[in-house]
């Protein structure tokens, strides 16, 4: 799938047959038929899928999460590519930024690969995860891969301790200065397949608290096909803030290439690109705060 970015060439699980791999690679998908992903992407039927609803009362306080401070060693990225892939906006980071500490295996580093956005057509929805069944207008994902154990993100997908995703909820309020570099060029990549290089992007501006102490952790999956498991999720308690004008720039984006003929009943607007929450099953949500 040419539009799936880092998972398009992901290494398949060993037990999959070659024809199954080819079938997954060649199938388009969308959010309107999200419940059917499992028909083509078997991992989407797994027991430990994402996103989930975070019930704050049921989260288990784990003080050991603070024994080793969660440490993002992020650097400013020069000449970052921002792409509309028809499903989301991706910011591909070329500079080597790494994450370690907190709930992550000791001595292992996770390299930041990209930032992805999920948003609603209206402010009442948009985030993939919910907190006590409350949705936010947007959710950002900072996607990392284990560069200690694997040679590439393709190798890390679907493996235990392979992927770590930091999720940040977004609410409407003041303009987010750190995201201006992205929102200001969205009009230039309105259609699927369009990309633009921005001169500078600082992922540190996305972190809500310099102490990084208020977060939840659970084990889950990618939220887009192939929905591979083995993903550690770190969700920050306090949301970022962007302006109404900034989120409206996302809502002008399109799911199709310019000039494409749309199917009946489809307006081509890119929005509501979030997967429904999945059953928690027997998983435990840990909290680094009380």
UniProtKB/Swiss-Prot annotation:
Keywords: Metal-binding, Phosphoprotein, Zinc. It comes from Rattus norvegicus (Rat). GO terms for molecular function: carbonate dehydratase activity; zinc ion binding. The gene is Ca8. Zn(2+) binds at residues 118, 141. GO terms for cellular component: cytoplasm. GO terms for biological process: positive regulation of calcium-mediated signaling. The active site is at residue 87. This is Carbonic anhydrase-related protein. It comes from the Eukaryota. Residues 27-289 form the Alpha-carbonic anhydrase domain.
